[in-house]
């Protein structure tokens, strides 16, 4: 959720990310109340708020694969700055470029409910952020120039995987 202090009726997001046999990533996302999402994950109950049959099918597949009862295991919180390209920049074609910067990342594997506040263990070192650039197709030269100028390199990173490793002392 993007709500500062979520309540039981606050909208929350469920995202399921997976890769197919060819390694192509797929993402399913829905918005509903936390209770509707918990019910779907734990006992398969589909609330009227959940209208995406593909996502429901994916959840049912995961429930079958992992023993029918999925439950929250990790809480991850961060502050996000989201930027997107203006519709038109003189001299440049519009390319739908988006940049997100996540900071103040914390996690916990106990009391994982949204309703237990935002506290947790730091996920990254102090003063580190995660910047994600989404540029469909080829990155424009101006973006490549900025990344090169500041020594920024592409790197894969999973917030959940990092939090899991830290919680298990595998770091």
Predicted regions and their residues:
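Phosphate-end processing signature that detects enzymes handling 5′-triphosphorylated RNA
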Residues: 1-171
């Amino acid at each position: 959720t993007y709500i500062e202090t979520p309540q039981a009726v606050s909208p929350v997001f469920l995202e399921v990310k997976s890769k197919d046999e060819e390694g192509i990533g797929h993402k399913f996302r829905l918005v509903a109340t936390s209770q509707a999402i918990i019910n779907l994950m734990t006992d398969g109950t589909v609330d009227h708020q959940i209208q995406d049959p593909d996502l429901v099918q994916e959840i049912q597949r995961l429930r079958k694969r992992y023993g029918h009862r999925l439950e929250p295991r990790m809480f991850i919180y961060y502050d996000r700055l989201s930027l997107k390209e203006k519709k038109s920049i003189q001299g440049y074609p519009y390319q739908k470029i988006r940049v997100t910067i996540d900071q103040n990342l914390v996690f916990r594997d106990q009391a994982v409910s949204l309703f237990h506040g935002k506290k947790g263990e730091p996920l990254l070192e102090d003063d580190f952020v995660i910047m994600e650039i989404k540029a469909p197709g080829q990155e424009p030269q101006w973006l490549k120039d900025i990344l090169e100028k500041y020594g920024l390199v592409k790197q894969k990173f999973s917030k959940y995987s990092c939090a899991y490793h830290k919680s298990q002392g595998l770091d």
